[in-house]
């Protein structure tokens, strides 16, 4: 950044973080409201469209893979044509696609709409990280990334069930989708007038030889961060996909909880994830990215393992264990996809780097890992075996993260 410390525009910094927080909250709401509406007893969506629970998993997988690919491709584009030209249309499109989810009449129509939504939400993630880093003072990169990233957990996993179920009491599922999509249009308009373009954009590659693209991988973390983020994403999406089934399955296969109790336990994922995405990246500004990531991985694995060993008799214990497992799992994700990715990027390629790291995590961790876990859950090891798979992945993430290079500005100056 060319601005001097004494002239730093703190007002612009906080405006951007506020707008990104709202935007990421809407992304989380739009992404996670579908399974809630699909499974709600007050919704006729499954009956109207002839959908099964397996279709819900398919829709989530397609959206995740589209999100990952788009995060990289559109992030790369944003480094060349500017932030607003990518970010604002992306917000508009995912908002319209959320509303369009309430207008479809078949599974294939819904698949098409959700894939377009994934394509439009991907650049919000990668370009959003770039915009935040460019607006943030170096010592606040982790804090600021944590603030807006935690909104996905807060809105998507904690508030979405409350919002959707309340709306479904008085409105059809079609109306709920339209109401959820409306605020994004307003945010997109405000973004156009507030977001500033970076002083330096990526080299357009006139020198030939693919240099500008390949230079993105010069930093060690550009190779390590995507590999370890796969493990964090895998843990999150395996839990999101199979936790409800594990909580409600008969004792032996699961914990045998009633739906209301299971929902209360599941709320630990959203609350813990929100706190983890905010607190640990902020702490990483002080103690360093590497140690924060390593601690997050190993603690997430430990708490998830103890969760699998807990019985159904004490739901408070289940909630606490799941809270901490989610908190540290989401913490690792936020550190890697935010400040670690940004600080590994060469000049002018912030969105490209963030997009590549997110692509790896979303495509493999968010798309392939739940499929593998589903196969495990359907086999002799059952649902608990799938959770063991997630915990094992977190241990692998810890091992890979050992090769990260420290990049926190405060630690580098020490």
Regions found by a protein language model. Name each.
Residues 290-339:
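C-terminal transmembrane helical hairpin of 12-TM major facilitator-type secondary transporters
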Residues 182-203, 400-405:
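C-terminal membrane-cytosol helix-exit motif in multi-pass small-molecule transporters
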Residues 2-10, 199-226:
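Juxtamembrane intracellular "pre-TM" segments in multi-pass secondary transporters
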Residues 347-379:
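A late C-terminal transmembrane helix in Major Facilitator Superfamily
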Residues 142-161, 168, 358-369:
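Glycine-rich segments within core transmembrane alpha-helices of 12-TM secondary carriers
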Residues 111-153:
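Cytoplasmic helix-loop-helix junction between adjacent transmembrane helices
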Residues 69-107, 284-287:
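Conserved MFS/SLC helix-loop-helix module at the cytosolic interface between two early adjacent transmembrane helices
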Residues 35, 39, 220-277, 333, ...:
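Extracytoplasmic gate region of multi-pass secondary transporters
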